[in-house]
Regions:
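A charged, well-structured terminal subsegment
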Residues: 1-6
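Phosphate-backbone recognition surface of nucleic-acid-processing proteins
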Residues: 111-173
Length: 173
């Protein structure tokens, strides 16, 4: 293996967390788009992620009591189609991620299984840590801190020396 080159397993595992992050961002965009379209009609209390979103859409009235315009309702319906597709894809990706983290899975190392068993650490955080950094070998704690973006940033001018705080140059994931 080349130095710094990830094998096929670790590289492939990263895709699950990254795809989920992309899907969540797209879900937020669709929800915001639907809410924006409805807010322009004086409707501020519609939640597109609730299970009864289609029934609520049919019952919605504009701020002045009129039914939603026909083409607006059709556009929101298409947005809901895309949102529901995203929700299904999210379920699929999360099921694949959860299967990978199962204690009976031979692929997950002991450290990952122990991490998944801790209270307060969910499957997304466990999968993200495993796919982004736990497979790497660090020689010391400075390398870990630098990878996480927690390395100090010194500043020096003449005889004046200060710590500027923590660097934000590590892996953003």
């Amino acid at each position: 293996d080349l130095p710094g080159f990830l094998g096929k397993g670790p590289q492939d595992r990263r895709r699950l967390c990254r795809e989920r992050r992309t899907l969540v961002a797209e879900r937020v965009a669709h929800v915001n788009r639907i809410k924006g379209l409805l807010f322009a009609q004086g409707i501020a209390d519609h939640e597109p992620l609730h299970g009864n979103r289609r029934q609520r859409l049919e019952a919605l009235r504009t701020g002045d009591g009129r039914p939603l315009p026909l083409y607006l309702k059709a556009q929101i319906g298409r947005e809901l189609d895309r949102l529901e597709l995203l929700l299904e894809q999210l379920k699929t990706v999360e099921a694949e991620r959860n299967a990978l983290l199962e204690p009976t899975n031979d692929v997950a190392p002991v450290a990952v299984k122990a991490l998944a068993g801790l209270r307060g650490i969910g499957p997304e955080f466990t999968a993200m840590l495993w796919s982004e950094c736990l497979f790497r070998s660090f020689r010391n704690r400075r390398q870990i801190a630098a990878y996480a973006g927690l390395a100090p940033t010194p500043w020096q001018s003449g005889s004046v020396r200060h710590e500027q705080g923590v660097s934000k140059s590590g892996n953003p994931r």
